[in-house]
C-alpha cells in the first residue's frame, strides 16, 4: 500500500465501509460486484501469502488488485460528496481533494518519466524507501544513461553493465563495446561474479538493484540519472582511474 497515494487509501476504506453499512439498500447485482471486488483485492493475495508463494520485486505480481482499489476509492469519493448537503461543504470538500491531488501530481512531475517508482509521502517517499524496495526495476533510466555514454565515450570504449543490458544493446553506439557482468546474490561482495575478469579501462553501468551501484568503489561516478535525490542508474569511469594508476 505504500505505493498508493494516501488520499486514495482513505477513500478506499470509506468506500468499503459505505457499501457494508448500506448493504440493505443495494440491488443483488451490486452486492455481487462488491463481493467480486473483495475477492480480487483480498482473497487472491491471501492465497499467495498463506501458500508461501515466492513474492518479490514490489507490487508487480499483485497489479490485478489496483483496478478494484480504484473502483472502491471512487465510490468513497463520490459518496462523501453526496452525503454533504450544504453547498459550502461541497466546495470545501472539492477544494481539499484538489489540494491533495495537486500534491500527488507534483510528485509525479518530479518523477517523470519514471512515475512507476512512486512511494507515498506517509511512507517517506522515494528517498526513504529506495534502500528497502526496488525502484527502477525495468531499467527505464538506462535510456538517459545510454545517451550520456554515446555522447561522452570515445570511439572503441568498453562498457561493463551489471543491469538489464537489453536496453543498452539497442541504444548504444556501434562504436562502443558492451560487456555484461553477472551479479551474485544480495549481500555478497563483490557483487559481480566476473567483475575481476574485466581489464581496465572501461565504464561501469548499474541500476539501483542490490549493491550493484557499490561495485568498483575506486572508480568515480561521472553520471547519474536520478529523481528526488535517488540515483536510478549511474556510470562509473574506470578509464580515468586506470590511467591515474
Regions found by a protein language model. Give the residues of each.
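Transmembrane alpha-helical segments
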Residues: 9-16, 42, 67-81, 101
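Signature aromatic-anchored transmembrane alpha helix within multi-pass, membrane-resident enzymes
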Residues: 23-26, 30, 34-38, 77-119
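Transmembrane-helix signature of polytopic, lipid-linked glycan biosynthesis machinery
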Residues: 40-58, 105-113
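Repeat-solenoid scaffold signature
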Residues: 54-93
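Aromatic/acidic, Gly/Pro-rich catalytic loop(s) in extracytoplasmic/lumenal soluble domains
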Residues: 177-245
Amino acid at each position: 500500500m505504500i505505493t498508493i497515494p494516501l488520499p486514495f487509501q482513505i477513500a478506499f476504506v470509506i468506500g468499503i465501509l459505505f457499501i457494508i453499512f448500506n448493504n440493505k439498500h443495494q440491488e443483488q447485482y451490486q452486492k455481487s460486484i462488491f463481493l467480486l471486488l473483495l475477492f480480487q483485492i483480498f482473497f487472491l493475495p491471501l492465497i499467495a501469502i498463506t501458500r508461501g508463494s515466492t513474492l518479490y520485486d514490489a507490487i508487480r505480481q499483485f497489479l490485478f488488485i489496483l483496478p478494484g482499489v480504484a473502483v472502491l476509492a471512487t465510490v468513497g469519493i463520490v459518496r462523501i460528496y453526496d452525503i454533504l448537503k450544504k453547498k459550502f461543504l461541497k466546495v470545501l470538500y472539492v477544494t481539499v481533494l484538489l489540494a491533495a491531488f495537486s500534491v500527488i501530481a507534483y510528485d509525479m512531475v518530479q518523477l517523470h518519466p519514471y512515475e512507476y517508482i512512486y512511494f507515498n509521502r506517509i511512507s517517506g517517499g522515494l528517498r526513504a524507501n529506495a534502500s528497502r524496495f526496488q525502484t527502477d526495476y525495468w531499467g527505464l533510466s538506462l535510456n538517459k544513461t545510454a545517451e550520456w555514454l554515446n555522447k561522452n565515450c570515445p570511439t572503441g570504449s568498453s562498457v561493463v553493465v551489471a543491469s538489464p543490458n537489453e536496453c543498452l544493446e539497442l541504444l548504444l553506439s556501434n562504436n562502443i563495446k558492451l560487456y555484461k557482468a553477472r551479479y551474485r546474490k544480495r549481500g555478497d561482495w563483490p557483487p559481480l561474479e566476473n567483475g575481476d575478469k574485466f581489464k581496465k579501462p572501461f565504464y561501469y553501468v548499474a541500476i539501483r538493484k542490490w549493491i550493484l551501484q557499490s561495485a568498483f568503489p575506486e572508480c568515480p561516478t561521472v553520471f547519474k540519472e536520478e529523481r528526488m535525490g535517488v540515483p536510478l542508474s549511474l556510470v562509473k569511469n574506470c578509464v580515468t582511474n586506470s590511467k591515474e594508476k
